[in-house]
């Protein structure tokens, strides 16, 4: 009974706004973290700011850069329900450790997911770097161990991703679309349309001259810039101005194979003034949020008369 506490609701109803728990920071992680040095895992760790045990990039997810020198290998082993790995550069294979199953051969631009109990040995044929996102911080907070696999290892080839994206671009209805992107899904999750039951992944094209209208959602986004030239950037802020733009926005300039965190609930928009197309890969915990019905995704949209509205469909 010594642990029991009683709080006045008026002073405990919103611990985040009261500063009792830390906000998820808008933070950038440069590509230099994985471009040099030895074979290693580099957690993109915000645990000290979040006030939780780490490593953790957000309260529920951990993003990492994995660098593997050519001819070398390392093991990833985490208590997760869902893992996602995107190959930024290099070629290699990922093999199950202490388990059956065929190895996954990968190259730059490929993406693959791994379920619970997936201890893997990643061997690089040449210098390689992967972006590794998983939900171990969520399980650590819940005090549980993942034992049941909700899906099987799944590979998304670069060619298939680009083919699906090109189909979206060629669709006549995309001429007025605010976003040109493909959501990566799994047949086991038809309701959420997400890549795992927890994780959400989108491969998006940012065309030349694009000025996307802002949108927001309650899931965190751990964004990886796949490729971009100077002049591509994201604007992030708390509120919208009367014209639908983001008020007092902070600018995040894109750098190839760098990552940044878009905190939940903030409006954000992507822009391309570089003269070259760019691509981005946001990873979110939106699979879980969609299942819980807490995603609350909203889009700013300009009406024909020039005014703006907020809608719950991308359009």
Language-model segments: which ranges?
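Short, low-complexity cationic-aromatic patches
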Residues: 1, 54-58, 72-84, 118-126, ...
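C-terminal functional regions that serve as terminal interaction/effector modules
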Residues: 1-25, 36, 220-315
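A short, N-terminal "cap"/entry segment at the start of jelly-roll beta-barrel domains
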Residues: 1-58, 143-203, 307-315
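Extended, compositionally biased flexible segments
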Residues: 31-41, 45-62, 75-99
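Conserved short histidine dyad/triad with adjacent acidic residue
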Residues: 41-52, 61-79, 202-220, 266
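Conserved metal-binding segment of the jelly-roll/cupin
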Residues: 69, 104-126, 133-136, 251-274, ...
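A short beta-strand-loop-beta hairpin characteristic of the jelly-roll/cupin
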Residues: 69-108, 225-256
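Double-stranded beta-helix
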Residues: 125-171, 273-315
